[in-house]
């Protein structure tokens, strides 16, 4: 059974406040054992709205859980996607303010800066054509 709109709002607000206060919260999958991918993306959408309303700017998207090992660990069978905001980027040489994070970690990411849009099923060639640089 899908989460209710109230449960989605509670989950999104919990995540939003955890980021602001830099305090851990429990796993949403424990709080809401019936949660599924569709619910997770609804929570993400509600969280994105909160962040945009707080003044953050959407800068891009990311694909996560691309390795089979991580998918197996989380009991999912497809990669997920996430939103990148302007406060998530640091330039070479920047000092990263560790106090901003609950648990400071650095993860290298490969970024594709796009010059065109992609939608639906696309070919490798279409991705290359839409990519400005990586």
Name each model feature, range by range.
Residues 2-134:
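Active-site microenvironments in enzyme catalytic cores
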């Amino acid at each position: 059974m899908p989460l209710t709109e109230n449960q989605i709002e509670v989950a999104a607000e919990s995540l939003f406040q955890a980021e602001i206060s830099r305090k851990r919260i429990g796993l949403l999958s424990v709080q809401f054992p019936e949660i599924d991918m569709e619910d997770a993306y609804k929570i993400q959408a509600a969280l994105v709205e909160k962040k945009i309303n707080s003044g953050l700017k959407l800068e891009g998207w990311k694909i996560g859980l691309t390795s089979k090992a991580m998918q197996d660990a989380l009991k999912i069978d497809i990669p997920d996607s996430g939103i990148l905001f302007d406060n998530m980027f640091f330039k070479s040489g920047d000092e990263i303010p560790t106090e901003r994070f609950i648990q400071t970690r650095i993860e290298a990411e490969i970024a594709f800066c796009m010059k065109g849009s992609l939608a639906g099923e696309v070919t490798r060639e279409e991705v290359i054509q839409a990519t400005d640089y990586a």
